[in-house]
Amino acid sequence: MKKMNRVVITGYGVVSPIGNDKETFLTNLKQGKHGIGPIQQFDASETGITMAAEVKDFPLEKYFVKKDTKRMERYSLYAIYAALEALEMSGINTEEEDMERVGVMIGSGIGGLGTIQDQVLRMDAKGPGRVSPMFVPLAIVNMAAGNVALRIGAKGICTSTVTACASGTHSIGEAFRNIKHGYSDVMIAGGAESCINKIGISGFAALTALSDSTDASRASIPFDKDRNGFVMGEGAGVLVLESLEHAQKRGATILGEIVGYGATCDAYHMTAPDPEGEGAARAITQAVQEAQIDPAEVNYVNAHGTSTQANDKAESKAIAHALTDNAYVSSTKSLTGHLLGGAGGVEAVATLLAIQEQFIPPTANINEVDPEIKANVVVNEAKETPVNYAVSNSLGFGGHNAVICLKRWEA
């Protein structure tokens, strides 16, 4: 039987509503400082939704020139930025690597939704002949991965997982398996999204999925008894994954290890989770079993925790079924909002930092945990505690469930 590779994390990058660099992101994560506020990117007055979690002060000039904004959608820019930050942290020199053994897997739930909106309006107003020739390459969902590969010269596998809000975690999990089974030495993996625009907000509002709160501090409140929907976020989170052998050979600083991955489907409903959380529980169990640990060894669960009534209740049942009361639970969406396909990437970074820094990020702005939530939820203040194993959950429309299990690195 072929020996399986261990898979380690050697770099990460993040673009998020609570920070675009590791120091700011970590500080806000520890302090429970949210990035939610009134929508600035367009006039949302007709949508009935006032709050979103937007990226602030994006340092475009660090890696891009002005023409890049015409040739790439915002979600691609976020993905490239996070990938380049992750590569820089990892210390990988692309000129010295066998780039045919370097792959990219970056998921997105919707891709260039803003471009689709703008070009449909342009076609309606001016006719088909005035549709931009850049429409298709800007709009298609795989171009975050494609643009990252183009930028760094990665010639291995390059894919984009599209599983709604599970996209980022699926991408990281599949990248983990790709290295584990020996197909790649290095993978750039994560998720990216940017659809805070009129059609994006209007569409999710029509589903009654969004919070209509006008109070930024009470809009995204996962597990709270008064939760009433999620807050749209945007950004990207990207990890550099390597085989342990490859990382050690080049003397890399190892930040953590991915030891398990689970992926299942509810096969229950287009947009609602299985109310018993059966599919999510199986995904957690798969990840823990692949990690070859007892469920009681999981110290922290970074929950999908969207702040919707249905998700939080079902997910808490899944956690209770698959794990034990030893696991602390929190949802960092109380800080970042819901990044859809980008959520899994950013939350993987948050989970890694929880392991590195030995703390549980808080679920912020909670007044009272819903009595029907049976999870051990950490609220309002970070908790310092040993974290050796943690899981990060992502659940998406279509019944998609993806879970990764991370382990603290001890040299």
Briefly describe each language-model feature range.
Residues 79-92, 141-145, 149-154, 158-193, ...:
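Active-site-proximal alpha-helical scaffold in enzymes
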Residues 9, 25, 33-163, 192-201, ...:
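Conserved beta-ketoacyl condensing-enzyme motif
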Residues 1-68, 90, 245-255, 349-363, ...:
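ACP-dependent fatty acid/polyketide chain-elongation machinery
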Residues 23-28, 114-128, 178-181, 201-214, ...:
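A glycine- and small-aliphatic-rich helix-loop capping segment at beta-alpha/alpha-beta transitions
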Residues 125-132, 170-173, 177, 193-249, ...:
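Glycine-/small-residue-rich "gating" segment that lines the acyl/pantetheine channel
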Residues 11, 29, 83, 104, ...:
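Conserved small-residue
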Residues 6-10, 33-37, 215-291, 300, ...:
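Condensing-enzyme catalytic core mediating Claisen C-C bond formation in acyl metabolism
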Residues 44-54, 111-115, 194-220, 262-282, ...:
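Active-site-adjacent elements of ketosynthase-type condensing enzymes
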